[in-house]
Amino acid sequence: MLKKIAHGLIGQAEKRVGVTFDYVHAIADTSFSLLSRYNRLFRFLDPNLFAPQDAYHVARLRGAISADCGTCVEAEINLARQTGMDTAVIDQVLSRTYSALPEALAATARLADAVTGQRTDDPDAREMIRSKFGEEALIELCFAMTGAALLPGIKRGMGYATGCDIDMMRKIAKA
């Protein structure tokens, strides 16, 4: 009975995000306890209480891109679009055309790339974010970027990740 409910809830999430969660179904089939632990990751990511929506989605997009998971990036595109994020901004984030972004969004993208993609630091970007959005938003953006990079790792480890074709993702974002 619990598995049936779990699969129904996963199906609802798939509809909301616009991608399939094959690996989450596999977790549900394997262990309800493991599914509960996995779901805690989403509760860690989903509440965006302090960061501006666009900055939050820039952080999540760049985090997912760093993990090279096509369906994960597609999910982040869909979530960003659902909040009304401008498709031109999404495209600039996908193509790394940061010079066209507002300064604080460019700083968010640079920090996400440094932290999740290069495993380095970008103190200037961090200070720009802190001065523009505040300390709480900075922390939340760090949760967003690293969380969006973490989930594809679970998916890849289970054998469900697909490589990310940025050109295809740009077409999806514009559709």
Show the residue positions of the predicted features.
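Acidic/histidine-rich alpha-helical segments that form the ligand environment
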Residues: 104-143
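Mobile cap/lid helix-loop segments that border enzyme active or cofactor-binding sites
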Residues: 1-53, 81, 173-175
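Short alpha-helical scaffolding segments that buttress acidic/His motifs in well-ordered protein cores
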Residues: 38, 42, 58-63, 93-94, ...
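Conserved alpha-helical segments that form or flank metal/cofactor-binding pockets of metalloenzymes
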Residues: 56-87
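Helix N-cap / loop-to-helix initiation motif
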Residues: 51-52, 84-88, 122, 134-135
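Alpha-helical scaffold segments that form or flank carboxylate-/histidine-based iron centers
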Residues: 20-26, 53-67, 139-142
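Acidic, carboxylate-rich catalytic segments that either coordinate divalent cations
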Residues: 146, 154-175
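Acidic/His metal-coordination segments adjacent to aromatic residues that form catalytic metal sites
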Residues: 94-103
